[in-house]
């Protein structure tokens, strides 16, 4: 009998969670940032979901959020026609980058010196963060609003997606190398540096392409419209979520569906594997983030696996290791197909 998923539920947002991103692994662990229509992106400890802080300053929905590799900086994209760069340690706003329309996506180079942005004005912009007063470099060519833009190939190239097109750009010449056209709206895009793989979702399809050439590798079909998908760092598994509130887990090599379960109480907008591959996070229309174990029952983070006593005949089952601080209250709830526990939540100030 398979063990049941026991997700960690991260509350605190008051509107739909539309984007999330993990940092790399640092000496202090790894971190998770979430973008939400409430305009208040949040930073959390990646392996427990515990709230660290909220970045305050946007005056509209935040559509995109990212952390640099060592989690010292954060960047956000918002409906207030700005992208902002933040000190992720202090929470201070470092700079506001004014745009002419809604900003949807942000991405740091590996050295954190440049920020790529894209949005409703159909332009890609590259900001030199060491020269905040300088005008950004601009790349035009998209025919509709840009949903996602990512650095790839050690920052030598850029991948960007609008409504029905994915484009590959050369950073040095600022010119288009190749494009892919789809017959329906592209809902998400993920870049995997190891192996240079691009994961694209559209409709019920999850497609894998070479990030260098955009040549197809393989594709899966899901039972419902998919809004986001993420490939495990070791390329063992793929997880996806979408309009039917469910999370799907696939064997990447065979394409076999390994499990599916109701993950949220609303459509799932974003899913991502952690940098160590031990868990994945999902964000939803229901306003929550949830963290899920890749291997159910393994001792990791707040999940503590308790083996059964000899001859008891009981199955091993995951137990939750409760933090010993009064501030971190964890409640157990039941959802349709899974148990759930809560990570620590933001402090409410009068």
Swiss-Prot record:
GO terms for biological process: alternative mRNA splicing, via spliceosome; maintenance of gastrointestinal epithelium; negative regulation of transcription by RNA polymerase II; negative regulation of transforming growth factor beta receptor signaling pathway; neuron differentiation; protein-RNA complex assembly; spliceosomal snRNP assembly. InterPro entries: G-protein_beta_WD-40_rep, WD40/YVTN_repeat-like_dom_sf, WD40_repeat_dom_sf, WD40_rpt. Residues 326-350 are annotated as: Disordered. WD repeats lie at residues 12-56, 57-96, 98-137, 141-179, 180-212, 221-262, 263-302. GO terms for molecular function: mRNA binding; RNA binding; signaling receptor binding; U2 snRNP binding. The modification Phosphoserine is found at residues 312, 335, 338. Its main location: cytoplasm. The modification Phosphotyrosine is found at residue 342. Residues 337-350 have a biased composition (Polar residues). SUPFAM superfamilies: WD40 repeat-like. It is found in: Cytoplasm; Nucleus. CDD domains: WD40. GO terms for cellular component: cytoplasm; cytosol; nucleus; SMN complex; SMN-Sm protein complex. Keywords: Cytoplasm, mRNA processing, mRNA splicing, Nucleus, Phosphoprotein, Repeat, WD repeat. The SMN complex catalyzes the assembly of small nuclear ribonucleoproteins (snRNPs), the building blocks of the spliceosome, and thereby plays an important role in the splicing of cellular pre-mRNAs. Most spliceosomal snRNPs contain a common set of Sm proteins SNRPB, SNRPD1, SNRPD2, SNRPD3, SNRPE, SNRPF and SNRPG that assemble in a heptameric protein ring on the Sm site of the small nuclear RNA to form the core snRNP (Sm core). Part of the core SMN complex that contains SMN1, GEMIN2/SIP1, DDX20/GEMIN3, GEMIN4, GEMIN5, GEMIN6, GEMIN7, GEMIN8 and STRAP/UNRIP. Part of the SMN-Sm complex that contains SMN1, GEMIN2/SIP1, DDX20/GEMIN3, GEMIN4, GEMIN5, GEMIN6, GEMIN7, GEMIN8, STRAP/UNRIP and the Sm proteins SNRPB, SNRPD1, SNRPD2, SNRPD3, SNRPE, SNRPF and SNRPG. Interacts directly with GEMIN6 and GEMIN7. Associates with the SMN complex in the cytoplasm but not in the nucleus. Also interacts with CSDE1/UNR and MAWBP. Interacts with PDPK1. Interacts with TRIM48. Belongs to the WD repeat STRAP family. This is Serine-threonine kinase receptor-associated protein.
